[in-house]
């Protein structure tokens, strides 16, 4: 699904969240949105999902204006949002049941998808009985089971430890390669953006506008991101992070004199 944002702006009352934003995201492309907290990245996702309407401008999927939620566009949050009274298999199957697919068939497909995310044998466990990483694997299975054309990810791994996060990034990349959805990823983790994305949009503080766009599509990437050191530093500088670190280092040096 091609996602198109045309002169999109968003206000909440007097709060100007997004300045005019115009970008096309090609079918099958993965774009990461990076920027300060509260700058409007998640709001862009919600508009693509049909949960929010732009104050001005248009958001479209394959040329059709997005006017509300649709199974073709799946939104996944940092919180796994699994129902605690349902097993992992039942949670995953629910995505198909909402589309009026037979309960037995939905359960069979859910078992297949749990196997795809390495949760075979945990189908009948409840969310509280497994780790946070396993819950997020189940949430990934639920996001992919309906084979969405667009996958909208709002910091899906932000609450996980570094090792689990890297493992799930690998799992996500494998699933994307299998299904080929368009993906928009909101993240505060620059390394995650560099590893997963074809393009990265770096946003300013609110009202959000794109400070710079980075094209990474021709790179075959591993978690060793040393070849992206210059790009990483530039992104951090755009976010003001290195400037703060350099100032902190100067202050520490001054204390030792």
Segment roles from a protein language model:
Residues 125-128, 146:
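Conserved signature/switch motifs of ABC ATPase nucleotide-binding domains
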Residues 89-97, 107, 111, 215:
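Short helical segment in ABC ATPase nucleotide-binding domains corresponding to the A-loop/adjacent helical element
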Residues 49:
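Helix-to-loop junction immediately C-terminal to a conserved catalytic motif
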Residues 76, 140:
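Hydrophobic anchor residue at the start of the ABC signature
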Residues 34-36:
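The feature captures the beta-strand-to-loop junction immediately N-terminal to the Walker
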Residues 57-69:
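Conserved ABC transporter NBD signature motif
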